[in-house]
UniProtKB/Swiss-Prot annotation:
GO terms for biological process: translation. GO terms for cellular component: cytosolic large ribosomal subunit. Belongs to the universal ribosomal protein uL3 family. The gene is rplC. The keyword NADP does not apply. One of the primary rRNA binding proteins, it binds directly near the 3'-end of the 23S rRNA, where it nucleates assembly of the 50S subunit. The lineage of its organism: Bacteria, Bacillati, Bacillota, Bacilli, Lactobacillales. This is Large ribosomal subunit protein uL3.
């Protein structure tokens, strides 16, 4: 089955009432009409995909390659460009727009974004480990625990202090509560990855119940 997709920007969270009176937490995603920047085919690119662009880039940040690429679609360079695979290429034409009506209430989607960055953190905050005793002469408070049975080797994957967050994450099987075509907004049930004002990619769910 062909998938659909659209790019947007996370606005924030709110809550809405459904028709039966249920209060549902939703994430508001701005989906200002995307522009089809490129249509990739097996013959020309080795795979099928449609390239979408969201949000105009400031002119001072553009360069000649980005301007030339956008010119083929009769548009301006975009801030956020991503590809959507497994789509029906016949539904897309270079330079056309993809709007909020791409999805409807009740659709199940996967949302990909960049999680909030927390910088360099220790085991307690990063991995949820327990701290040591804080009194009675203990000299072990927030340090990592044992590194394993072999004294001169640290096994791959060992949880140690390091950078936390700022990873690409996908939340699957989220429900579209409403699609507001007048204000170019999608309301998605629950939360989606990333901070407010961060870019997200919304695709038809790959594991949705059939």
């Amino acid at each position: 089955m062909a998938r659909k997709g659209i790019l947007g920007k996370k606005v924030g969270m709110t809550q809405v009432f459904t028709d039966n009176g249920e209060l549902v937490p939703v994430t508001v995603v701005d989906v200002t009409p995307n522009v089809v920047m490129q249509v990739k085919t097996v013959e020309s690119d080795g795979y099928e995909a449609v390239q979408l662009g969201y949000g105009d880039m400031r002119e001072v940040l553009t360069n000649k390659p980005s301007v030339g690429h956008a010119k083929k679609a009769d548009t301006t360079p975009k801030r956020f460009v991503r590809e959507i695979r497994d789509v029906a290429l016949s539904d897309y034409e270079i330079g056309s727009e993809v709007k909020a009506d791409e999805f409807a209430a009740g659709d199940i989607v996967d949302v990909t974004g960049t999680s909030k960055g927390h910088g360099y953190q220790g085991n307690i905050k990063k991995d949820g480990q327990s701290r040591g005793p804080m009194a009675h002469g203990s000299r072990y408070h927030r340090r990592p625990g044992s590194l394993g049975a072999i004294i001169n080797k640290v096994f791959k994957g060992k949880k140690l202090p390091g950078r936390m967050g700022n990873h690409t994450r996908t939340m699957q099987n989220l429900q579209v509560v409403a699609a507001d075509t007048e204000h170019n907004v999608l309301l998605i049930k629950g939360n989606v990855p990333g901070a407010n004002k961060s870019f997200v990619t919304i695709r038809s769910a790959v594991k949705a119940a059939k």
